[in-house]
A protein has these predicted regions:
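Bacterial N-terminal signal peptides
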Residues: 8-16
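Compact beta-sheet-dominated domain cores in extracellular/mature segments
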Residues: 2-4, 20-123
Length: 123
């Protein structure tokens, strides 16, 4: 039992570490923004311009797109500082996220989630 709990804890830590991995600036593909792995990016209506309010369990389900150390904001691409101090990519001031339930590039299962407050990020 203890061994399976330890494996479960390690899996959770590994998942959290990969979910918040640093990324270069997003790109557009098929009319929507995607991360470096081709996963769909989303915006959250409850975020204020330049401020993410998706923290804790929200950020577990909607991992923020964390800025790689060598990346710089340019044009409509901005960087916001999260409550935990991490830097997150934003487009026109709207923080960007992936969705934990999207399993492959091109999935858009988070679009319209939670009574329509989550949206696919588009150019």
């Amino acid at each position: 039992m203890l061994k399976s709990l330890s494996l479960s804890a390690l899996s959770t830590i590994a998942l959290a570490a990969t979910a918040f991995a640093a990324e270069p600036a997003p790109s557009a593909k098929n009319g929507m923004f995607v991360d470096a792995k081709g996963m769909t990016l989303y915006t959250f209506d409850k975020d204020a311009a330049g401020k993410s309010v998706c923290n804790g369990p929200c950020a577990t389900n909607w991992p923020p797109l964390i800025v790689a150390d060598n990346s710089k904001a340019a044009g409509d691409w901005t960087i916001v500082v999260r409550d935990d101090g991490q830097k997150q990519w934003a487009y026109k001031g709207k923080p960007l996220y992936t969705w934990a339930k999207d399993t492959k590039p091109g999935d858009t299962t988070g679009d319209g989630f939670m009574n329509g407050v989550w949206h696919v990020a588009k150019p």
